[in-house]
Amino acid sequence: MKEELIRIEHGYFHSESGQYQFDVSIAHGECIGVYVDEHLTSGTAYLDIFKGKTVFTDGRAFCCGQRIGATGLERWIRQNAIVVDKSRFASKELTMRDFVLALVRTNHLRQRFPSTERLTSLAATDMLHRMGLNLPWSTRLIDLSMLDYYRLSIFRAWFNGYKLLVLDRLTETLRRQDLAKLMDCVQLLLRHGTAVFLFDMDEAFMFRYGSRIDVIRGRRTFFRLYPEEYGPRLFELLGWEGGKGVHRFEHTAMTAGAPVLSVRDLHFPALPPMTFDIRRGEIAFLRDENYNTGRRLHECFLGDRGWTSGFFR
């Protein structure tokens, strides 16, 4: 049996969106999924526990088997938990070295210089290689691929000795093949004893990696689902008869009018040409398979730069 890391029994929490009742439990080297009925309320409040924004007001809390109060829990989370969410910190100036050293644990400045030496240690070099992150430390964050950015975030958690890693909805950001590569990096941390919470709305992802799924319904921990129960039982607990909640909504066909924008043979460096129309009364969806197209289109439309040839009409 794995050693317990953190446990909160009958925990009452207060956030800007109201009151919540959560039971939290995870052990060293354990990966637990958290599936919520409403991410904007319960999901945000639960996630904010690990960002220090949701306040523990009542209940019993334990860290490594020791009973602690609200202040002790807040301090433990601040020192031992790190959240990696789907938003990317894309700086044009900061490097990988800055990201690992300067942006983490600023309240432990005395550790900075020993950490600088550890960046080139055999252990750090080996971990980087095993994660597939073979780039110089001087590489700018903005020049990293989406996958490498998240690999670096996982490495940062390991390098700084965080005991609890929280991943928030990365299935909404990464392509499936890249997500599998990232989870290989997460598995390395699990084998080192790091505990991992997965916040996500992709049940297949949860079923694959979670040793348990905590189901949040009605602003409280409603049920704990174990692998032998994985499947339709999840949706039954959430009251989503017939499958996942989004399936209840029917597709609404929109009547598209005349084109308001026509793009022909738009070329960007290292990308195939693009041709598309956006019509009046239409919601256009552009799927970005290489993570760079969306940024380059943004620069093209709003920054008036970035393309090599093509025309608009």
What are the language-model segments listed below?
Residues 199-201:
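H-loop/switch region of ABC-family ATPase nucleotide-binding domains
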Residues 2, 110-121, 224-262:
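Pre-NBD coupling/linker segments of ABC/ABC-like ATPases
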Residues 153-154:
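Hydrophobic anchor residue at the start of the ABC signature
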Residues 33-48, 285-299:
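Glycine-rich P-loop/Walker A and Walker A-like loops and their local beta1-loop-alpha1 context
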Residues 87, 92-112:
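Q-loop/switch helix immediately C-terminal to the Walker
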Residues 59-67, 75-78, 310-313:
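Conserved ABC transporter NBD signature motif
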